[in-house]
A protein has these predicted regions:
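Residue-level detector of solvent-exposed, low-hydrophobicity positions
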Residues: 71, 85, 99-100, 111
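Conserved catalytic-core segment of NTP-binding enzymes
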Residues: 1-88
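Generic C-terminus detector
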Residues: 114-115
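C-terminal boundary of histidine-terminating zinc-finger modules
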Residues: 88-103
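A short, charged, Gly/Pro-tolerant segment at domain boundaries
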Residues: 104-111, 120-129
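Alpha-helical membrane and juxtamembrane elements of multi-pass inner-membrane transport
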Residues: 1, 5, 99-102, 106
Length: 129
């Protein structure tokens, strides 16, 4: 709570992407984060569901998006390739841009970019590698 309030005060124009996994407990935690963002007047850009698939199920992101009255930006599948690329320090979107997971992540990023408020401060980060 205190950290979130401090961040909102330090970054009053920040925009929030709420990330959850399909499980109900994760949705509850992410819901509290989203409500904290709203209570501190931070704009919620949308919700991302992570680790979607056979192991954890799906639908938690959509339920949370509805609860927070925010768009569902996308559902990222539980993909071993995503972990493997993270372990070697090369983003999946760079190493395997044609993979389903990479395309979903790029789609989420493009949606976030398109939804930015006018006057948002954007700083490009170079890809290392």
């Amino acid at each position: 709570g205190d950290v979130s309030i401090s961040l909102a005060q330090l970054l009053p124009r920040a925009e929030v992407v709420v990330v959850t996994t399909p499980q109900k407990l994760a949705q509850d935690v992410a819901s509290r984060a989203g409500k904290m963002a709203r209570n501190t007047n931070l704009r919620i850009v949308g919700v991302v569901e992570n680790m979607t698939g056979d192991v954890f199920g799906s639908g938690g992101g959509a339920a949370l998006a509805e609860e927070l009255d925010a768009p569902l930006l996308g559902s990222v599948p539980l993909d071993p390739l995503l972990r493997e690329q993270g372990d070697v320090g090369e983003p999946i979107v760079a190493a395997h841009p044609d993979s389903e997971t990479a395309q979903i992540i790029v789609g989420i990023a493009e949606t976030i970019d398109a939804a930015r408020e006018p006057g948002s401060i954007i700083k490009s980060l170079p890809l290392v590698g």
